[in-house]
Amino acid sequence: MDRDEFIITVYCLVCEQYQVIKNTYFLRRGGFAPALSDEEVLTLEVCGEYFKLATDKDLFTYFRTHYAHFFPHLRDRTLFVRQAANLWQVKAAIQYRLTQVSGQATDPVQIIDTLPLPVCGYTRSGRDRCFKPFADYGHCAAKKLDYYGFKLGLRITRCGMITACPLLPARPHDIQLLDDLVAGFVGLVPADKGFIDTFRQTVLAERHGVFVITAPRKRMTTAHSPGLLKACARLRKGVETVGSHLTERFAVARLRVHDLWHFQHRLIRKILAHTVGVFLNLQLRRPPLDLDGLVTL
């Protein structure tokens, strides 16, 4: 589909889901109704993220210039940004509903990983006042990166749809965050070696029905068959692909805001945009993680 078709498709999808959840959240207590509808704002955000418009200014300018005929009431950037931020709960609810209606939330095999989320340059971290006391120093062994900020937890299905994305502290080792990543899930969980903890894995399996499968370290024995380990290693490539999407296409590691509330709002927006892309690919019977091929430029 081309860009026009994509925008219309996203708008129809947003309207369908918004009608279901709009009575759950008290969005505004009084005053005049905004000129731009909530459905239009959500569509602008999702499409803007997909088009790699990382900042509110870029997003507003692009659609004001090229799609004023689609969104004739898009006139004031400040009002648009404020309205978008106030819809953070709606965005989270729509993202959750898409995992439900697509059937992906019940996938018995879901893969976990974490991503570093720096909030500023490492050398500026000592002077940061925006995220104290929430942000902290962390280390990403895979990227050999020391950073100041948070971790983004990821749990995805075999198709690549994100079913859980908790915002986690940066300092603890991944294994200490395992309970947050598998909360509410029962099934098989392929993970990397950073999640190896025999005692914790045994407790999760016996008490909660969560079977965390990790590749063994050198000279480490394992009860898992080579076939299972090979299958889990193949599945882990999916979470690495999703991590690359979020880092490169959706720029989650370059969120430059001044407080935790706006940080979470921007993060939820990017997660929703990724989920919409995977959802549409599934509907069109395309490779779920082929986001580049979804829209022809």
Question: Model-flagged regions — what are they?
Answer:
Residues 1-297:
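Short alpha-helical elements
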